[in-house]
Amino acid sequence: MIPGNRMLMVILLSQVLLGGTNYASLIPDTGKKKVAADIQGGGRRSPQSNELLRDFEVTLLQMFGLRKRPQPSKDVVVPAYMRDLYRLQSAEEEDELHDISMEYPETPTSRANTVRSFHHEEHLENLPGTEENGNFRFVFNLSSIPENEVISSAELRLYREQIDHGPAWDEGFHRINIYEVMKPITANGHMINRLLDTRVIHHNVTQWESFDVSPAIMRWTLDKQINHGLAIEVIHLNQTKTYQGKHVRISRSLLPQKDADWSQMRPLLITFSHDGRGHALTRRSKRSPKQQRPRKKNKHCRRHSLYVDFSDVGWNDWIVAPPGYQAFYCHGDCPFPLADHLNSTNHAIVQTLVNSVNSSIPKACCVPTELSAISMLYLDEYDKVVLKNYQEMVVEGCGCR
């Protein structure tokens, strides 16, 4: 990408995304002139311009709640659950969602604006006390969750496959128990566990099972208790061990297929949290495009198209979806007298009236009057997959203020 274009996109992003906040004044006039001169000069930037660009990228990353620019590993796998959740959250057309079997989790998302996914630390599977008597212990590293985020709920998702040639129907029931590990090893060599959730399932269905592990995750994150992990126990109710646990994908060793299958079938911990900013992840309905009358050289205040392509700022390697979005912007005159369609305030009307007789008083400005949110699916600095709701990212209406 041309360096000048990249700089221009960063400045446009800062103006559009941060406009209307105190950040808008972070670009001094001298800096604007310097950047413009560099762009017009063929794209070669001075050290001062490079520093300015870095400062703006840092500002934008802070707005996204990131300490530094993510540098994702090529081995990172985005769980299908997170992709499907993003698609459901982003209000895609119904006919485009036919391949999604899951239902939108209305209750967990109603109290959260952030969803994070975690895989267990596989290198800890061989530690003492990790597997005993059919119990599998899983340790999840939750250190990437910011301290300002409050966990509202959490679930452990396990994938299970149908057994085609299993036992008779009345012998095909299993119980799955999920425990919080209180002590990994005691004096007698056993784990001390606390039951979190349990369910009886039958082997004739292939699907994901979700278990509530909120109490444990809240203790680890809010109460700062030691995280010894979770334990999973699969019990055949008829004590038949031939198929016991083989269809529940809780360990790579139980999966005869390729590693590519394991990456999408392995246990998945999902946390729902809120950072205190903005609204929860309420599922949005698809908006109908606004019909605007064609205007001939209309210079009045109105909304204009502005598509932000994340590849233009080099962020497409860590932003999974969307590839970009229509941000829009407001531009145009606020002439006297202000017409009703210019969505003006009483103060703007008075200011425009005074300007008509005293030019030292500025006119009312064309600014966003209504903004909406977008959802972003991305990889954070720790290679964790995050779905987050960002407020005031799209201009829905303009007016003279």
UniProtKB/Swiss-Prot annotation:
Homodimer; disulfide-linked. Forms heterodimers with the TGF-beta family member derriere. Part of a complex consisting of twsg1 and chrd. Interacts with tsku. The lineage of its organism: Eukaryota, Metazoa, Chordata, Craniata, Vertebrata. It comes from Xenopus laevis (African clawed frog). Residues 20-287 form a propeptide. Residues 279-299 are annotated as: Disordered. GO terms for cellular component: extracellular space. The gene is bmp4. Posterior-ventralizing factor in Xenopus mesoderm induction. Induces posteroventral mesoderm and counteracts dorsalizing signals such as activin. The keyword Metal-binding does not apply. This is Bone morphogenetic protein 4. InterPro entries: BMP4_TGF_beta-like (IPR047833), Cystine-knot_cytokine (IPR029034), TGF-b_C (IPR001839), TGF-b_propeptide (IPR001111), TGF-beta-rel (IPR015615), TGFb_CS (IPR017948). GO terms for molecular function: cytokine activity; growth factor activity. Belongs to the TGF-beta family. The keyword GTP-binding does not apply. Disulfide bonds join C301-C366, C330-C398, C334-C400. It is found in: Secreted, Extracellular space, Extracellular matrix.
